[in-house]
Amino acid sequence: MSLISADNIVKIYQSHSLVGASARKTMLHDISISIGQGETVALLGRSGCGKSTLARLLVGLERPTSGEVRFRGVPLTKLDRSGMKAFRREVQLIFQDSPGAVNARSSVRAIIGEPLRHLTSLDETRREERIQELLRLVELPPEIADRLPAQVSGGQLQRICIARALAVNPKLIILDEAVSNLDIHLQASALALLTKLQQEGGIAYLFVTHDLRLVQKFAARCLVMDEGQIVEEIKTADLDSMRHPASRLLREAVLPPLPVRAVETN
C-alpha cells in the first residue's frame, strides 16, 4: 500500500472580475501519483506548471475539484478529527520561502515547538528536550533557540524549518522548492542532511523542484510535470533518456559544472 497517493486529481480555480465576469482555470488535469514508505520522488517542472498546487493538495491545505488524495489508502475526506490530526503529524511541508514560512517575531524555540504544542501532548519540559534534540539533529547550536529569524543565516533558517517539520516524526516530508534559494554549498549540505535523516528514520520525500541537477543528486524516481499534467515518469538513473519535449527543455537548462570555452575555428 502507498503511503500517500493522488487518484485522478483535477483542480479548477474560478476567479471573478469587478464587472462580475468569471473565469475558470484548470491547474491540474487528471493527476495520479503514489509515494511509498522511505521513497524519494522528485516532482520536476518549470515555474507555474502546477507543482505547488499539487503539493498543497497532498498536505490537505486545499481540496481537489475532483479526484481523491489518500493517506494509507484512506481518502482525506473520510478522516475524522483524530485521523486528520494523525495525518498532520505524519505529513509535513517545507516551503521555498523560509522567511515567509515563519513568524518573524517568534523565537527559533517557538518556531520548532509549534507542531509539538498543537500535535502532541508533551509537557513544557519534554517539549524543550525535543527542541534541543532537533537542533542537534540539524546540526545547529543550542543557543540559537533564543534568536529571532532575522538573527540567523538563510541556511540556518532552512535547517530550522527542517527541524520544525521533523518535530513530530513524520513519515513523509514534501519539500516545495525548499533548497532552491540556497547557494550550491548550502544546497549540498541540506540534501546530505535530508539523506542522513531518511537513512536513520525511513522518511519519504516528495522533492518539488525545477532544477534537474538537484533531482540527480537526491531522488530515485522523477515525475515530470507540464501545464498541470504528469507528462513523464522515469528513474533518475535514466534521466538522459527523457523523451517528452518539456523534459528535454529542463535537461537542456542544466548548466555545466564549469563554463565551456568556445573553440575558435579558422
Swiss-Prot record:
It is a peripheral membrane protein. InterPro entries: AAA+_ATPase, ABC_transp_ATP-bind, ABC_transporter-like_ATP-bd, ABC_transporter-like_CS, Nickel_NikE, P-loop_NTPase. Gene3D superfamilies: P-loop containing nucleotide triphosphate hydrolases. Its main location: membrane. ATP binds at G45, R46, S47, G48, C49, G50, K51, S52. Transmembrane segments: none annotated. Residues 4-252 form the ABC transporter domain. CDD domains: ABC_NikE_OppD_transporters. Its EC number is 7.2.2.11. GO terms for molecular function: ABC-type nickel transporter activity; ATP binding; ATP hydrolysis activity; nickel cation binding. Keywords: ATP-binding, Cell inner membrane, Cell membrane, Ion transport, Membrane, Nickel, Nickel transport, Nucleotide-binding, Translocase, Transport. It is found in: Cell inner membrane. Belongs to the ABC transporter superfamily. Nickel importer (TC 3.A.1.5.3) family. PANTHER family: D,D-DIPEPTIDE TRANSPORT ATP-BINDING PROTEIN DDPF-RELATED, TRANSPORT ATP-BINDING PROTEIN. The complex is composed of two ATP-binding proteins (NikD and NikE), two transmembrane proteins (NikB and NikC) and a solute-binding protein (NikA). Part of the ABC transporter complex NikABCDE involved in nickel import. Responsible for energy coupling to the transport system. NCBIfam families: nickel_nikE, PRK10419.1. This is Nickel import ATP-binding protein NikE. It comes from Brucella abortus (strain 2308). The lineage of its organism: Bacteria, Pseudomonadati, Pseudomonadota, Alphaproteobacteria, Hyphomicrobiales.
